[in-house]
Amino acid sequence: MPRPALSVTSFCHRLGKRERKQSFMGNSGNSWSHTPFPKLELGLGPQPMAPRELPTCSICLERLRDPISLDCGHDFCIRCFSTHRLPGCEPPCCPECRKICKQKRGLRSLGEKMKLLPQRPLPPALQETCPVRAEPLLLVRINASGGLILRMGAINRCLKHPLARDTPVCLLAVLGEQHSGKSFLLNHLLQGLPGLESGEGGRPRGGEASLQGCRWGANGLARGIWMWSHPFLLGKEGKKVAVFLVDTGDAMSPELSRETRIKLCALTTMLSSYQILSTSQELKDTDLDYLEMFVHVAEVMGKHYGMVPIQHLDLLVRDSSHPNKAGQGHVGNIFQRLSGRYPKVQELLQGKRARCCLLPAPGRRRMNQGHASPGDTDDDFRHLLGAYVSDVLSAAPQHAKSRCQGYWNEGRAVARGDRRLLTGQQLAQEIKNLSGWMGRTGPGFTSPDEMAAQLHDLRKVEAAKREFEEYVRQQDVATKRIFSALRVLPDTMRNLLSTQKDAILARHGVALLCKGRDQTLEALEAELQATAKAFMDSYTMRFCGHLAAVGGAVGAGLMGLAGGVVGAGMAAAALAAEAGMVAAGAAVGATGAAVVGGGVGAGLAATVGCMEKEEDERLLEGDREPLLQEE
């Protein structure tokens, strides 16, 4: 049937409906229209990518830790995989899809390769935009009760600085009483170091404003030993030395107890290789008393830790009334007046490791130049002070912290070609060892000789521990084989350890020097007894397991059902004294033999041969869980 022709009115009506429909679908700009349909993307331009999640473990659903990848595509943490894998399945079965597949390198290989990438330093432009603030750090704090608090975090920040970690270090320490010009001298040294590091000379930079520097330990609530956090590399190329500045603070304060001052001297000895004792006007008795004690403590510390006691010492007399007089002559006059009272200081100053330097007071007019103006005398003082600072900084690389010759016979690590020089990391470890001794509770000391006795006893105690641990390790190695272990009953092993412990206590106890010798021996005996008990617990369990295995095998191979009686009798007769611990072994031997019986009797030779073969393989591979573990 032919379609009727559309009139003009019908055509306009249909066209209006289509336009309204398109407007409803979002092609018009009306505010009430719906959101337009998304357009079809042809993929010709860049597509926004959804953020990819980090790979997670298929078991714990957390970020992978030490990952293991399988051929099936699943990844697991090594701990999750070891916990949920099927025992005895080789190659392993995937805990998720249960497919048997091999391990592949996968994520583990990628992580290992990323660790091998070289750590590139930041470009100079970025380093300048984000500099690390250099400041004085408090290393040793004196609390309100007069005790010492060692801040290992601050020590590690300084000595393990990237410029000092693997580099020999020189520590310039300024000693002296309060108001003796320590901060003044430290600021001049600090201002001269950058120029010497860059090759422009070691004289202080700037004018009056730059001489103020920073405030070293100015806060009375934070007394102790301070160090400048940033090292300066001085010396020739290939032989650079990281130089630090150290302020000993209140180490000479008479308010502190004698024990605290001795400990501060010990820490100062470890934290210095070039000492400057700054005094005002003349050397006083307090200065000489402190210096005598400091030299004595340095000798004790050097003997115990194998370090050079005093590498270089300057006696700097500021505001001296004899600025034109030679320093050694000035010291000679002092010791003529105080002869015999300070033997160690006198011996030190007569050698080549120490010198005396004199500086005039600022503004003091020379006696033979009465017409000189104050500005001229200040210029003279600056000139002499600048010459001294330049001389000290130029000589600093020659006095890096070092050990005594012959100390390296113990087989320690080599540092930068010269085995005697200490790097920053090695010095930080030595300070940590020293803090461990200082932190122990025990009898106090009031003299360097008593401190030397405590360090001597500490060395003897550590030697006794090492000797006993070595003996236990030898017994562990000697009884790893099954038949070797069965020859030594647990009671016999216990007696061997007890005899060795008593011999060590008797031999090392005679050499102890401190008054609290009995308390030291009791503490040492308790530690040795704990080591022996830990070994005996593991040894007894291993012995019982070996005995049960051998008893069951022999009983089954020889007499079938009656072999169980033989196995039980063998275990019971061998360990009558260890009945409680070995009853399980005897029962296993009897039950196993009774059930298996004669069915395996014909395979006795093969069984024993397999046991010995497995034992040899285990010896070659080594025990996965040794009885004695070292941290």
From Swiss-Prot:
> What residues form the membrane-spanning segments?
547-567, 580-600
In this chain the GB1/RHD3-type G domain maps to 166-397
At the top level of its lineage, which domain of life is listed? Eukaryota
Q: How does it sit in the membrane?
A: Multi-pass membrane protein; Peripheral membrane protein
Q: Is the keyword GTP-binding assigned to this protein?
A: yes
Q: Could you give a GO molecular-function term held by this entry?
A: GTP binding
Q: What is its main location?
A: membrane
Where, in this chain's numbering, is GTP bound? R318, D319
Report the InterPro entries cross-referenced here.
Answer: G_GB1_RHD3_dom (IPR030386), Guanylate-bd_N (IPR015894), P-loop_NTPase (IPR027417), Znf_C3HC4_RING-type (IPR018957), Znf_RING (IPR001841), Znf_RING/FYVE/PHD (IPR013083)
Instruction: State which tissues express it.
Output: Predominantly expressed in brain. Decreased expression in glioma brain tumors as compared to normal brains (at protein level).
What does the entry report about post-translational modification of this chain?
Auto-ubiquitinated.
**SMART domains given in the database record:** RING (SM00184)
| EC numbers | 2.3.2.27
The cellular component terms of Gene Ontology attached to this UniProt record, alphabetical and capped at eight, are: cell body; cytoplasm; endosome; membrane; neuron projection; nuclear body; nucleoplasm; nucleus
Q: Where in the cell is it found?
A: Membrane; Cytoplasm; Nucleus; Nucleus, Nuclear body
Instruction: Give positions of region: Interaction with ZBTB16.
Output: 131-631
Q: What pathway, per the record?
A: Protein modification; protein ubiquitination
Tell me the Gene Ontology biological-process terms attached to this UniProt entry: embryonic brain development; endoplasmic reticulum organization; G1 to G0 transition involved in cell differentiation; neuron differentiation; positive regulation of glial cell differentiation; positive regulation of neuron differentiation; protein autoubiquitination; protein homooligomerization
Q: Which residue spans match zinc fingers labelled RING-type?
A: 57-98
Keywords in UniProt for this one? Cell projection, Cytoplasm, Cytoplasmic vesicle, Endosome, GTP-binding, Membrane, Metal-binding, Neurogenesis, Nucleotide-binding, Nucleus, Synapse, Transferase, Transmembrane, Transmembrane helix, Ubl conjugation, Ubl conjugation pathway, Zinc, Zinc-finger
Q: Quote the catalytic activity from the record.
A: S-ubiquitinyl-[E2 ubiquitin-conjugating enzyme]-L-cysteine + [acceptor protein]-L-lysine = [E2 ubiquitin-conjugating enzyme]-L-cysteine + N(6)-ubiquitinyl-[acceptor protein]-L-lysine
State whether it acts alone or in a complex, and with which partners, per the record. Answer: Self-associates. Interacts with SP1 in an oxidative stress-regulated manner. Interacts with SIGMAR1 in an oxidative stress-regulated manner. Interacts with ZBTB16 (via C2H2-type zinc finger domains 1 and 2).
The entry sums up its family as follows: Belongs to the TRAFAC class dynamin-like GTPase superfamily. GB1/RHD3 GTPase family. GB1 subfamily.
Function statement: E3 ubiquitin-protein ligase that plays an important role in neuronal differentiation, including neurogenesis and gliogenesis, during brain development. During embryonic development initiates neuronal differentiation by inducing cell cycle arrest at the G0/G1 phase through up-regulation of cell-cycle regulatory proteins. Plays a role not only in the fetal period during the development of the nervous system, but also in the adult brain, where it is involved in the maintenance of neural functions and protection of the nervous tissue cells from oxidative stress-induced damage.
Q: What is this protein's record name?
A: RING finger protein 112
Lineage of the source organism?
Eukaryota, Metazoa, Chordata, Craniata, Vertebrata
Gene encoding this polypeptide?
RNF112
